[in-house]
Amino acid sequence: MSSTLEIKDLHVSIEDKEILKGVNLTVNTGEIHAIMGPNGTGKSTLSSAIMGHPSYEVTQGEVLLDGVNILELEVDERAKAGLFLAMQYPSEITGVTNADFMRSAINAKREEGQEINLMQFIKKLDKEMDFLDIDQDMAQRYLNEGFSGGEKKRNEILQLMMLEPKFAILDEIDSGLDIDALKVVSKGINQMRGEDFGALMITHYQRLLNYITPDKVHVMYGGKVVKSGGPELAKRLEEEGYEWVKDCLLYTSPSPR
């Protein structure tokens, strides 16, 4: 069954400064959308607001998941509803192993009595770790503690594959990765691709899109989505930069799809 994530006229402020000034965007399962734009245009603010970061105040608009306004839900309820955020800077949690964290997260999404048993969990974890070329000992390390930048990003994708959300928001998942790590991360995202999964990928660089072909590319500027198109739009940005995007501010569509 297909699902829809719809962002409608979203305005977001932090410390009384408005960052998002009316974002409109619709993503369906079966689609991967890329969001690009210069620094300071609100890309990461968008991901944080969708997931309910307490530092960001939504002053106007809605974020609808299958018609339900998730802005009225707590962070854990948003995750249970089917949202996942791969963070740019994942937190370290001392005393909680990677495996325990993921099993708890899986069971938190499930109804009582439907929890994943230990053998099912280990079988799936081993399979996904092998697919992502992750050392098995990482499962017993404390979450992100002492992980390299590349290990943290691979671990975010491992969590994505274990949790199988409806929608993932991938906030600069490619930042700081060498080419080998980028290929592994991209392989994991492409493996998730299908009719039951949708994603918003926030990135600065065309290089990620060389490995993950998006269905749509959106350009953010001045706190809004000002241009939408196909993969060719990202290539134009790489060749010409963002200066030409300023002209699009006069022609912003109210609901790019």
Regions found by a protein language model. Give the residues of each.
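ABC ATPase NBD Q-loop/coupling interface
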Residues: 62-78, 144
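The feature captures the beta-strand-to-loop junction immediately N-terminal to the Walker
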Residues: 36-38
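Conserved structural motif at the start of ABC-family nucleotide-binding domains
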Residues: 5-7, 20
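Conserved beta-strand-loop-alpha-helix hinge in the C-terminal portion
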Residues: 220, 224-247
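ABC-family P-loop ATPase nucleotide-binding domains
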Residues: 91-166
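Conserved small/polar residues in nucleotide/adenosyl-binding loops
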Residues: 251-257
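Walker B catalytic motif
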Residues: 172-173, 180
